[in-house]
């Protein structure tokens, strides 16, 4: 993003809607007296009470109720570094929490099943037992508004995060990567 404003404004909009978004700071970089330019530094997405507030799932959390969270999962294009946890159509999903190397088969099966349930109920007319029982609707509305208003070319198949706390619903976000 040559303007250096897309990430900053998208994250600001998300925070104004009441959601976590990475903190961003502009900084001018000078190395040994040589000006390198203006850059945007931003927080990495991770789990803690001031960022994505979900419990950190442990390797021993393989049965109900503990297996229900917390997860941070992203739809992303992989470059060979991150192992794909599961696929939905042409979209690859990668674990962010638990870390890919720490995710158990049971945890991967659980979170994949949650995404499949969401997809299965996406067009249900049943408002009581349909998609509203699976997803946090306001988080999806906010997520879609920010991404659409900012014309995020990556959204839905790449750089798209979701999270789920223990016992909670699947939430969209945090928003990420508006530099295209």
Which residues make up each language-model segment?
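Phosphate/dinucleotide-binding and metal-coordinating scaffold of catalytic cores
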Residues: 1-180
């Amino acid at each position: 993003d040559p303007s250096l404003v897309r990430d900053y404004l998208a994250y600001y909009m998300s925070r104004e809607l009441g959601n976590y978004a990475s903190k961003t700071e502009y900084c001018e970089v000078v190395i040994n007296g040589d000006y390198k330019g203006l850059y945007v530094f931003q927080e990495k997405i991770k789990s803690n009470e001031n960022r994505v507030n979900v419990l950190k799932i442990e390797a021993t959390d393989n049965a109900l109720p503990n297996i229900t969270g917390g997860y941070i999962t992203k739809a992303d294009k992989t470059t060979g570094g991150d192992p794909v946890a599961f696929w939905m159509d042409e979209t690859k999903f990668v674990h962010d929490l638990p870390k890919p190397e720490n995710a158990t088969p049971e945890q991967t099966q659980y979170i994949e099943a949650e995404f499949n349930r969401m997809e299965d109920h996406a067009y249900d007319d049943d408002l009581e037992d349909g998609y509203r029982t699976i997803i946090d609707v306001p988080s999806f509305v906010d997520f879609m508004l920010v991404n659409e208003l900012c014309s995020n070319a990556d959204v839905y198949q790449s750089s798209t995060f979701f999270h789920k706390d223990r016992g909670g619903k699947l939430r969209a976000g945090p928003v990420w990567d508006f530099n295209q």
